[in-house]
Every structure is written in structure tokens, then in C-alpha cells.
Amino acid sequence: MPNQHTLLLFNLLPVGSNISTWWNFGSMLLTCSALQVMTGFFLAIHYTANINLAFSSIVHITRDVPYGWIMQNLHAIGASMFFICIYIHIARGLYYGSYLNKNVWLSGTTLLIILMATAFFGYVLPWGQMSFWAATVITNLLTAVPYIGTALTTWLWGGFSINDPTLTRFFALHFILPFAIISMSSIHIMLLHTEGSSNPLGTNSDIDKIPFHPYHSHKDILMLTIMITTMFTIMSFSPDIFNDPENFSKANPLVTPQHIKPEWYFLFAYGILRSIPNKLGGTVALVLSVAILMTMPFTHTSYIRSMAFRPIMQLVFWTLIATFITITWAATKPVEPPFTIIGQTTSFLYFSFFIMNPLVGWLENKISFHS
């Protein structure tokens, strides 16, 4: 045993033989995480967390630092890839009932919240127009907290408006939170491996397991190759595809952009926020849009784990996916008809999924098992 090749030690990890490509996104997320830490480290070496120098330091990285443009673009595109993978990973969990493994699901949802915070802080760092105004709008939501809201906001800003102390602390937070992500990921993976992966059938895999290596290791490598190739292709041909044109202008507190909007991966939550015409209500809905995922293990009523054998729930699930895409699209549009009503309808449908989950489960049990 002591002389065994490291990969061969994965022979000790038995995995269900029928897990599909949807189970590959965990390893892809791990790779994204490693890539973000590496590129982020090289960017942090040259970045200056000062409101007068931050924007120039990004320009300096892109133009003057050897291969700085690769680091900067990979870090930006890597963030989008991270979110694409995590949303697919969550959708897989919802579809195949992976959330019934409570500890794994709750640690994963916590990971998502930390990741979203990290990405938000990172978006502020270039100190472009959209960075500044997105930070202003989102941090301002804290004032909606009863009694302590104003004090909380002033404390977060480090002053009475977004200024140099805010940028400095956001850089510090953006630097330290990835370590929290790495720690939580380790916990997430350890909790997963106490019970093992679920599978598309939602059955117990114990009767039919194969070694992780070479079968699943090669399967993972294929998807990783596709992901990295996609990233480098985007970086080479259209590196600014995910960027907002406003963010190429330095932050100016005196000029408000026409449409303040966050990066695409926050648009669904932003769409829900702005579909409620009340500050506190919108803030609560914004937090709930992610936190509501935590209710899934406790509202599962069906006798069947996977949606593969639940046609009514499949309809509800694909409605959720369509809703998610529609909110994302509607949130890029100005606040005027018909976009306001589209945003409100899709927000209602988004939350309806989590209410329908126990009801449809109960209905399916009635149809399938009590006829």
C-alpha cells in the first residue's frame, strides 16, 4: 500500500456505476475554485485598494504586467464559469433529490451564500461606474433593517458614504472569504463521502459500485477539459462578453448610470428584489431567494426521491428553470411595463416551486400509492 500511486488510492472510493454527467460539476467547481485562487493571488500582487488608484491598477495589470491580461480575464470569466457550474450543480440536486442528504445540502447552500458574497465584493474592486453604483445600491439595502439599519450601513461603509475605507475592507473580505469557501468545500465533500453520492434513479447504489479511478476520474477529466477549453476560447475571442460597458469608466459618485445592474449571475435575485415595491419587502425576498433552498430537505413529501419518475414534479421543475432564465432576462431591462409585470410574475412563480414541492409530492403519493 505505501508505494501505491496516489490516483490508485481512489480505488478505495467506490462510486455508483450509473451517475451521469450531471454529477461531474462538483469536480468542475473545485477546479474553478483553485483557478480563482491562483489568478486572484497574482492580481492581488499588483492591485491597489485605494479609490484613486484601484481603477488605474486594473489598467496597469491588463496593459503592463506580463500576462496580466490573462490573469485578469481568466479571473473574470472564471467567476462566470463558477456560477454556471454551481447553478447546474444545484439544479441537479433539486432534480435528483440530492437534498435529502441534509448535511451536504445545507453546507452547500451555505457555500453558495459565501460565494455570492465573495463575488459581490470582487465586483466592487475595479472601482468602475457599475462597481461603485452596484455597491451603493446593495449595501444601502441594509438601511431597511429595523432599528439598527442605519448604524449597520455606516459601520459597513466605514463612514457616511461609500469611500476609501469601504474599498479597503471589501478587498480584505474578498481576499479572506475564498479561504472560508475552501474550508466549507472540504466539509461539504467530507459530509458527502460519509453517505456517498446519490444517482439518477434515486436508489441505493451499494449493490452496484465501481472504483472512482479509472472510470469516474476519466469522466471528470473530459468535462474539465471542455470547461477549461471553453474558458480559454472565451478569453481569446471575446474576453469582455460578461462585462458591463459602464464598468470601463472610473467610478463617479456624481453620475448615476442609466441602468444599475449587477453581474448576470445575480440578476435573478436582483429581479426578485426590484419586483417588490417596498425596501424591506424586497430585501427579505432577496435573502429568501437563496435561503429558501435550505427548506428543500424538510418539505419533501414524495415516496420517490428522484424526479426521473415524477412527471408532475418534472413539469414544476422545468417551470422553475424557465422562470430563473426569464427573471434573469427581465432584470436586465429598465423598470417599466411590460418588464415590471414579467418580473413580478416570474418572482411569484420562482417561490411557487418551493410551495408546490410538498403539495405535488403529496398528490403523487395519492395517485401512485393510494389508488
UniProtKB/Swiss-Prot annotation:
GO CC, alphabetical: mitochondrial inner membrane; respiratory chain complex III
Binding site for a ubiquinone: 193
GO molecular function per UniProt: metal ion binding; ubiquinol-cytochrome-c reductase activity
Stretches that traverse the bilayer: 25-45, 69-90, 105-125, 170-190, 218-238, 280-300, 312-332, 339-358
UniProt: heme b b566 binding residues: 89, 188
Cross-referenced InterPro entries: Cyt_b/b6_C (IPR005798), Cyt_b/b6_C_sf (IPR036150), Cyt_b/b6_N (IPR005797), Cytb/b6-like_sf (IPR027387), Cytochrome_b (IPR030689), Cytochrome_b_C_euk/bac (IPR048260), Cytochrome_b_N_euk/bac (IPR048259), Di-haem_cyt_TM (IPR016174)
Keyword terms of this UniProt record: Electron transport, Heme, Iron, Membrane, Metal-binding, Mitochondrion, Mitochondrion inner membrane, Respiratory chain, Transmembrane, Transmembrane helix, Transport, Ubiquinone
Disulfide linkage: none
Binding sites annotated in the UniProt record for heme b b562: 75, 174
PROSITE patterns: CYTB_CTER, CYTB_NTER
Localisation per UniProt entry: Mitochondrion inner membrane
Gene3D superfamilies, per the entry: Cytochrome Bc1 Complex, Chain C (1.20.810.10)
CDD domains: cytochrome_b_C (cd00290), Cytochrome_b_N (cd00284)
Membrane-related topology note: Multi-pass membrane protein
An annotated GO BP: mitochondrial electron transport, ubiquinol to cytochrome c
Cofactor: heme b
Description of how the protein assembles with itself and partners: The cytochrome bc1 complex contains 3 respiratory subunits (MT-CYB, CYC1 and UQCRFS1), 2 core proteins (UQCRC1 and UQCRC2) and probably 6 low-molecular weight proteins.
Job of this protein: Component of the ubiquinol-cytochrome c reductase complex (complex III or cytochrome b-c1 complex) that is part of the mitochondrial respiratory chain. The b-c1 complex mediates electron transfer from ubiquinol to cytochrome c. Contributes to the generation of a proton gradient across the mitochondrial membrane that is then used for ATP synthesis.
Family: Belongs to the cytochrome b family.
Other noteworthy facts: Heme 1 (or BL or b562) is low-potential and absorbs at about 562 nm, and heme 2 (or BH or b566) is high-potential and absorbs at about 566 nm.
UniProt-recorded name of the protein: Cytochrome b
Organism in which the protein naturally occurs: Coluber constrictor (Eastern racer)
